[in-house]
């Protein structure tokens, strides 16, 4: 029997029962729960343990059906709050708290209420901030930290990142947004100026040849199409970035190259070949980053703009390099030559990879 919960303003207790490999759950009211326990003790069980805030109890049933009840008092624990069955998700940016850039970007109104049609964007922004929250210990509080966001687009997430790190968490951050669309850059700089975000700047340019900084603490790349993601990742490694957050898209390169006789029954179907190629591309990227001294994870990221769900590669610099041999064997077996592999090896040979 589990803990209390509130369903439609009625306090219920949940019981779980295992039948074979299935776990069945059922909710009971107080009276129904007592009847359920009595029935189970009479028919199926000989011992019942209960834990309470002040008293713990044990009910023992003999073979003849005699019940013995033992009680033990203990210090009162902190009161446990009854959980709502459908509890509200606790977001980092909370509904009801007006945030200037979310208002101007049409995600919420001036009272802080989320616009219904933009709720998916609100969830996406908060999910992204959760990824950042996990890596906060890697960001220094003793100096200014530099974050470069390539492919910032309309910059929902760039503004959210600045607001979260500087306004909510108190980090001294300098965030640089790069994009190839001039009109987007002008609008974002105008908004940053309006909000007084003095260390948030947007520039027209490509991360592959960006030389505006010599050292970057975190690189964010969202929806850099196809091999643009690889150039961004290679640049991040070159800078020795402590953290990399990347949401790739349009992974076409491997789809054009992949050949493997054993996998031909799968690869002959276009849609399966496309999906497999995308997954292989991101797995290889993560493995290559590990070979350059990063600990990597591939996580699910909500993204309504491109696909219902997407993947995010999160890499944290450890300095411990993994063996690249297994990756190279797989690349050879699949006849693929990823751009990131070439870029990282070129940088290694030039001696510029840290």
Predicted regions and their residues:
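Conserved Class I S-adenosyl-L-methionine-dependent methyltransferase catalytic core
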Residues: 52-145
């Amino acid at each position: 029997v589990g803990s209390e919960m509130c369903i439609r303003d009625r306090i219920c207790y949940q019981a779980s029962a295992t039948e074979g490999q299935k776990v069945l759950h059922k909710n009971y009211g107080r009276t129904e729960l007592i009847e359920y326990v009595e029935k189970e003790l009479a028919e199926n069980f000989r011992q019942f343990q209960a834990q309470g805030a002040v008293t713990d109890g044990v009910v023992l049933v003999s073979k003849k059906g005699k019940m013995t009840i033992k009680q033990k008092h203990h210090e009162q624990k902190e009161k446990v709050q009854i959980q709502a069955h459908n509890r509200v998700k606790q977001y980092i940016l909370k509904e009801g708290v007006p945030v200037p850039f979310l208002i101007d970007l049409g995600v919420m109104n001036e009272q802080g209420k989320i616009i219904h049609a933009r709720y998916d964007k609100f969830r996406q922004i908060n999910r992204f901030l959760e990824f950042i929250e996990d890596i906060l210990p890697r960001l220094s509080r003793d100096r200014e930290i530099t974050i470069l966001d390539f492919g910032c687009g309309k910059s929902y997430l760039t503004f959210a990142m600045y607001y979260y790190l500087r306004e909510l968490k108190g980090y001294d951050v300098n965030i640089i947004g790069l994009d190839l669309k001039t009109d987007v850059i002008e609008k974002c700089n105008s908004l940053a100026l309006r909000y007084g975000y003095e260390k948030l700047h947007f520039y027209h340019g490509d991360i592959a040849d960006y030389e505006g900084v010599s050292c970057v603490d975190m690189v964010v790349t969202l929806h850099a199409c196809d091999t643009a993601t690889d150039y961004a990742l290679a640049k991040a490694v070159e800078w020795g970035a402590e953290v990399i957050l990347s949401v790739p898209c349009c992974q076409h390169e491997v789809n054009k190259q992949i050949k493997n006789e054993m996998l031909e029954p799968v690869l002959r179907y276009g849609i399966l070949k496309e999906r497999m190629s995308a997954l292989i591309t991101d797995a290889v990227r993560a493995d290559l980053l590990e070979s350059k001294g990063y600990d990597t994870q591939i996580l699910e990221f909500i993204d309504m703009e491109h696909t219902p769900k997407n993947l995010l590669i999160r890499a944290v610099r450890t300095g411990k390099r993994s063996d690249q041999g297994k990756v190279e064997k797989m690349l050879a077996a699949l006849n693929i030559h990823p751009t990131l592999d070439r870029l990282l090896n070129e940088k290694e040979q030039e001696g510029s990879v840290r």
